[in-house]
Amino acid sequence: HDLHGVTLAVIADADGGLTVFGLNLGRDTLASAKARFGDTLQPALVARLGEVGALEALMEPFSAGFVSGRLVLSFDVSATSLQRWRERAGKSEAMEGGVRRFDMTHEDRAEADGARIAGLSFVPGLKLSEADVRQRFGEPAETLTQADGVRVLLYPAIGMTAAVPASGKTRTALQYVAPRDFNARLRAPLVAAAAAASAASASASATN
């Protein structure tokens, strides 16, 4: 598989920032993304039951060079703002995975335009193996295994993780944040999840 078009779109700068697909993570806003991608970008407030939720923007199909797939932008928004937007939402609709999508008011959508892009995920339409990822991006700094067998390859220099499913039923997901935020936003949650998976596995072995 050729991921050449994807890697060409990633530029890390000296101060720990990152530009992916023309968007500077941590600096550009939802308004910047709308200006770049137009009406095909779909912003939404999404949340699971009992959660405050998150502001996301989806674009599918999204073309990254020669590879197309699904692009999801995530944003830095305070819990207070998210709670207020959710309470004022007129209605919501159910999505897959127990997630609900909330209709934001016109005023809240205007406020959301100023939210800074914290990171993004790109799921290529083609299936990628761990070997494909290594061939394109080189040896990862670290590899972690999650409870569901997903292997996550970590590339802190370009603020990227590649989550490769064990079964091949789902597609490989590439996640990007600014390299300066890599440990806090991506690595720390992954390490915690991998440790929990390892502990659960050890416990299961001990009881068998």
Please identify what each model-predicted range represents:
Residues 8-21, 108-118:
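Acidic/histidine-rich, surface-exposed loop or edge segments in extracytoplasmic proteins
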Residues 30-208:
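A cross-family detector of function-defining hotspots
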